[in-house]
Swiss-Prot record:
Residues that bind [4Fe-4S] cluster 1: C60, C63, C66, C109
Cofactor details (free text): Binds 2 [4Fe-4S] clusters per subunit.
Record function comment: NDH-1 shuttles electrons from NADH, via FMN and iron-sulfur (Fe-S) centers, to quinones in the respiratory chain. The immediate electron acceptor for the enzyme in this species is believed to be ubiquinone. Couples the redox reaction to proton translocation (for every two electrons transferred, four hydrogen ions are translocated across the cytoplasmic membrane), and thus conserves the redox energy in a proton gradient.
Source organism of the structure: Baumannia cicadellinicola subsp. Homalodisca coagulata
Group of enzyme by EC: translocase
Family to which this protein belongs: Belongs to the complex I 23 kDa subunit family.
Name of protein: NADH-quinone oxidoreductase subunit I
Any Pfam family: Fer4_7
Annotated compartments: Cell membrane
Single GO term (MF): quinone binding
Quaternary structure, from the entry: NDH-1 is composed of 14 different subunits. Subunits NuoA, H, J, K, L, M, N constitute the membrane sector of the complex.
UniProt KW keywords: 4Fe-4S, Cell membrane, Iron, Iron-sulfur, Membrane, Metal-binding, NAD, Quinone, Repeat, Translocase, Ubiquinone
Reactions catalysed according to its record: a quinone + NADH + 5 H(+)(in) = a quinol + NAD(+) + 4 H(+)(out)
EC number: 7.1.1.-
Length: 180
């Protein structure tokens, strides 16, 4: 080993120690995430939830628009009807391992049942645990739109009257009778 190599080696070691020492007193760039919560904007799109209307019923009418709008096909549901004639999903399933949190399902929902929340901590050890059922997604509250009730805005079906028998309503036309 020559004297030049010895001096160069000592210089590089001292330079490294000096750089580490100078960085020790600088402001930290790393955010201490679990201790200090991360700031999120008001438009942040996180975990998907299903909300209820002000009367306490679930808002989802199983129209399937959210599943059609989803670009990665992570939403699946099946429609059923209650005794009162109200539609609701028999099952509602979201596979969060495929979801890209784009928000298209929230925009497509006519009843504001699907809403994206600021929650983003959904880490799991098994991929099967990222498939959420309706019971996991349903929250007891109206979410972002507390006063909106789809059935009050769209109207309620009358069970005792047929189509066209209510006031100011014309009877439906059978289009097959119009054909030659």
């Amino acid at each position: 080993m020559t004297l030049k190599q010895l001096v160069t080696g000592c210089y590089t070691i001292l330079r490294s120690i000096w750089m580490i020492g100078m960085q020790a007193f600088n402001k930290r760039e790393t955010q201490m995430y679990p201790d200090i919560p991360i700031y999120q904007t008001s438009r942040f799109r996180g975990r998907i939830v299903l909300t209820c209307d002000p009367d306490g019923y679930e808002r989802c009418v199983a129209c399937n628009l959210c599943a059609v709008a989803c670009p990665v096909d992570c939403i699946s549901l099946q429609k059923t009807e209650s005794k009162e004639g109200r539609w609701y999903p028999e099952f509602f399933r979201i596979n969060f391992s495929r979801c890209i949190f784009c928000g298209l399902c929230e925009e497509a929902c006519p009843t504001t049942a699907i809403q994206l929340t600021p929650d983003f901590e959904m880490a799991e050890f098994k991929r099967q645990d990222l498939v959420y059922e309706k019971e996991d997604l349903l929250i007891r509250g109206p979410g972002k739109y507390p006063e909106y009730n789809f059935y009050r805005m769209a109207g309620i079906a009358c069970n005792d009257k047929l189509k066209g028998h209510a006031e100011n309503e014309t009877r439906p036309i059978n289009v097959k009778d119009l054909l030659p």
